[in-house]
Amino acid sequence: DRRQRQMCIRDRARMEYRGYDSAGVAVRSETKGLQVYKSKGRLQVLSDMIHGGADVEGTLGIGHTRWATHGEPNDINAHPHVSEDGRIAMVHNGIIENYMEIKQQLLRHGVTFKSETDTEVAAQLLEFHYNECHNMLEAVGRVLRRIEGSYAFGIICADYPNALIAARKDSPLIIG
């Protein structure tokens, strides 16, 4: 609903003091599936793009403001990152120390990447495990056991219309 859309933008604005180079939101809609909006620059750029949330349809969403650690600041590297099949959207704060090793393994399995980020590696790894076990919580558990470093993840999946999955280790996470 409209309140939820506005809350996603408002909560990103509250995080603005931390500094960032891009922002984005992913929202799940019954009619449109996962919709992802992201942009380089200040939060106002994203807000203008989606007319303050008025252009976004859905009732479940995740949002992120990014300070680049892997990959340059641009629209492609902005969060949320979406799995290859478009069913999973993920935001992440932290650093995945072994992301290059995981990326190389996924490349050998034919996975393609759009961004230069460790977060997209985590999103593609999640899709890989989800396709194997067909259970999102099990797939998330496999990802968390595989990655090294600090993280706070927010995850939504088109197959789970009312579920938001969150996990953290040594990084802050806001749920609201």
Label each region the model flagged:
Residues R3-Q6, R10-G176:
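Conserved short alpha-helical segments that host acidic/polar catalytic motifs at enzyme active sites
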